[in-house]
């Protein structure tokens, strides 16, 4: 166990796992339709600046001996110091070492595989050399944007994103065109698998294979089957990197079946996955009291942006409508929306055009909107993992944040108890007033 400035990092090199990947029974398969065209980095990159990571460390990005184009992009985007996760992962990752990393939300995991892949890429027109898989369309879209931002000065590198929502023929057209074919493919398992299966995406030249939020994909049999088939279509010798905020011992073992002697980095023990700088409270109330209390909180709390989580599409739609009736700048995202509309709404929220987002758990994992500093669980999450991913929307990159969970039933109370036991935290009752200095970054 190596103690870092404010985190515990467990780092180890594991032995090669000789086990074959197991086969799984057929499961219901959802093939997601496709996505926008590949972007070259002559296109305008997202100019949104996140600022420096939390903590001041002696190690700077220059110490990683990255390409000048990458260092220029890092500086241009306002990053100054690597996070603890990046300090431990990047030096090995850029050498092609397999990486298995568990780190809490907001610690810069995405930049690890983006920088490692871009550092090593040798683009050849018509060849896909990097595949990144993730479990939602929104996350795929966001990761594609991160590649675009960091490769803004690598004008010969093209990134494409493939997910459901548009006809697959659009993706097939891009991949068939040597001048448009992306060198980096970000996608959801269903759509990527369909393109590989139909021999439209040639994975035989892939050198880097990445799973983000890997537990979500490997726990679901249909997604796991798709991931395995894509994996088998790639060369035996390649770099494999997997990342998530939560990794059970079983899933860790599954991950390592895809890898050869991976560097394993576990930031904070699983039982201590708390978010630094995040104030967490709960509030007991009746179901019928939720709307009035939410109204009071939105009136009285100071916030940049707030995420409100509910348990169903219907409740998301109804609560969003109610908030708009009360003149709150609200918008909602849920699985019932057409893909183009979901992406449009996500962009509006990220661009600060709306300050309140009502969402189902589809928005809970991996989605990064840096201005969010308050999360309200209007409906309790289903389990401790879901809670972690929801409240992780606030307090990104070690900044301050506030999470409030409504508890209105015995079942809610049980979930709260499991959360406290799992993460060894005591979540107190919401006081009459909360000092804004404790959750607003000055």
Swiss-Prot record:
Main location: nucleus
Residue intervals of the Helicase ATP-binding domain: 90-265
Placement of sequence motif Q motif: 59-87
GO biological process terms on file: mRNA processing; mRNA transport; RNA splicing
Subcellular location: Nucleus
Domain of life, source organism: Eukaryota
Coiled-coil annotated spans: none
Catalysis performed (reactions): ATP + H2O = ADP + phosphate + H(+)
EC number: 3.6.4.13
Any Gene Ontology CC annotation: spliceosomal complex
Helicase C-terminal domain ranges (all copies): 277-438
Sequence motif DECD box, residues: 212-215
Record keywords: ATP-binding, Helicase, Hydrolase, mRNA processing, mRNA splicing, mRNA transport, Nucleotide-binding, Nucleus, RNA-binding, Spliceosome, Transport
Pfam family, one: Helicase_C
PANTHER family on file: ATP-DEPENDENT RNA HELICASE DBP3
Domain notes: The Q motif is unique to and characteristic of the DEAD box family of RNA helicases and controls ATP binding and hydrolysis.
Job description of the protein: ATP-binding RNA helicase involved in transcription elongation and required for the export of mRNA out of the nucleus. SUB2 also plays a role in pre-mRNA splicing and spliceosome assembly. May be involved in rDNA and telomeric silencing, and maintenance of genome integrity.
The protein's name in its UniProt record: ATP-dependent RNA helicase SUB2
Species the sequence originates in: Cryptococcus neoformans var. neoformans serotype D (strain B-3501A) (Filobasidiella neoformans)
Classification of source organism: Eukaryota, Fungi, Dikarya, Basidiomycota, Agaricomycotina
Name of the encoding gene: SUB2
